[in-house]
Regions:
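C-terminal peripheral helix-coil segments that are non-catalytic and often amphipathic
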Residues: 88-96, 131-147, 157, 166, ...
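Short hydrophobic clusters on alpha-helical segments that form packing/core surfaces
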Residues: 13-21, 93, 167
Length: 196
């Protein structure tokens, strides 16, 4: 009879495995490396995840939950104008990448490029994350429209998607250049152009 799953072991697998995938890439990270980093026997991996693909979905869920927990409240701050909240939100995300020396990129973008061509489950998870992300930004943009801060002719949902696309592009550039310059360009040129 198999032993019952231990939530601490699962969390350790997600944390250590997520770090490895962020640093090396999904395809370059094996189950044995993940379990070794987490300090658990290799066979234990399959007590928590049906497959490496299921693990990918789980680390994406964990990563996105962390982003929402850390930065999501910025978009809901009622004492701050909506467009200022959006600028602060993206500045917070940029600061995260600065703290990591622009080396790891965004797990969402990395996995979209690396894994979606071969995994429908990962693609579906990423699509759900992008919808959630876009929805949170669009709600803030609708509030800006209602307050007269954003032109009535702009579609908040399309604008939110465009902001994400532009920011994710800046993340990729910072990873290549190991420089904050792409974020500075996003903040100085892209953000003001799109939201005024």
């Amino acid at each position: 009879m198999p032993r019952p799953a231990n939530p601490e072991t699962r969390s350790r697998l997600l944390e250590k495995g997520g770090e490895l995938v962020s640093n090396r890439g999904f395809n370059a990270t094996g189950v044995q490396e993940i379990t070794a980093a987490a300090g658990v026997p290799k066979g234990s991996f399959y007590n928590y995840f049906d497959s490496k693909e299921a693990f990918a979905v789980a680390i994406l869920t964990d990563y996105w939950d962390s982003v929402v927990a850390t930065y999501g409240a910025i978009l809901d701050e009622q004492g701050t104008p909506p467009l200022s909240r959006i600028a602060r939100y993206f500045a917070g995300l940029a600061e995260f990448h600065h703290r990591h020396r622009y080396a790891v990129g965004c797990l969402i973008g990395n996995m979209a490029l690396e894994v979606t061509p071969t995994s429908e489950d990962v693609r579906a998870k990423l699509a759900a994350i992008y919808r959630d992300w876009s929805g949170a930004l669009a709600a803030c943009l609708r509030e800006a429209q209602a307050r007269g801060e954003l032109g009535a002719g702009k579609d908040p949902q399309q604008l939110a998607g465009t902001l994400i696309d532009a920011f994710e592009g800046a993340v990729m550039r910072t990873k290549v250049e190991r420089s904050r310059a792409p974020f500075d360009n996003f903040e100085r040129f892209v953000l003001p152009t799109l939201v005024t």
